[in-house]
Swiss-Prot record:
This is NADH-ubiquinone oxidoreductase chain 4L. It is an enzyme of class 7 (translocase). It is found in: Mitochondrion inner membrane. It catalyses: a ubiquinone + NADH + 5 H(+)(in) = a ubiquinol + NAD(+) + 4 H(+)(out). The gene is MT-ND4L.
Length: 98
């Protein structure tokens, strides 16, 4: 396995572990999700260029568009919850909570 692939897999794994460990604050969860999406984007672009699959060359850009939409919605949710509750705890997003 190439060292760059190993580094990207480790970056994705660390971001996933970070999202699981620091899930109490919405901002840290969003940062970990962005790290996961960035490592997926780079891995996808490298694999497509390595295997010369130029018919799939739009796939990393589509992933990047979905990542930008996710970041925009996440930041809007962060602003709304912090203005309503005064903090960014994920437990405030639970609608079943009384």
């Amino acid at each position: 396995m190439m060292p760059i692939n190993l580094n990207l897999i480790m970056a994705f794994s660390l971001a996933l572990i970070g999202a699981l460990v620091y899930r109490s604050h919405l901002m840290s969860t969003l940062l970990c999700l962005e790290g996961m999406m960035l490592s997926l984007f780079i891995q996808m672009a490298l694999l497509i260029s390595h295997f010369h699959m130029f018919s799939m060359s739009m796939a990393p850009l589509i992933l990047l568009v979905f990542s930008a939409c996710e970041a925009g919605l996440g930041l809007a949710l962060l602003v709304k919850t912090s203005s309503n509750y005064g903090n960014d705890y994920v437990q405030n997003l639970n609608l079943l909570q009384c």
